[in-house]
């Protein structure tokens, strides 16, 4: 499976507490911060919840020799 690059692009001020907790669970603390996450249903569910606050890009796995 691939990976997802998740970038925090919009402030969570004024949004529900559970959305702020979801951002923290994804490892996002500051605006414009990016993290790599595995592409699985659990992560996709979290991203669906905060889709209006983040930008998601698919990243190909690197080949390890």
Swiss-Prot record:
GO terms for biological process: translation. Part of the 50S ribosomal subunit. GO terms for molecular function: structural constituent of ribosome. Coiled coil: none annotated. This is Large ribosomal subunit protein uL30. Disulfide bonds: none annotated. It comes from Chloroflexus aurantiacus (strain ATCC 29366 / DSM 635 / J-10-fl). It comes from the Bacteria. Keywords: Ribonucleoprotein, Ribosomal protein. Gene3D superfamilies: Ribosomal protein L30, ferredoxin-like fold domain. One of its GO terms (cellular component) is cytosolic large ribosomal subunit. PANTHER family: LARGE RIBOSOMAL SUBUNIT PROTEIN UL30M, MITOCHONDRIAL RIBOSOMAL PROTEIN L30. Belongs to the universal ribosomal protein uL30 family.
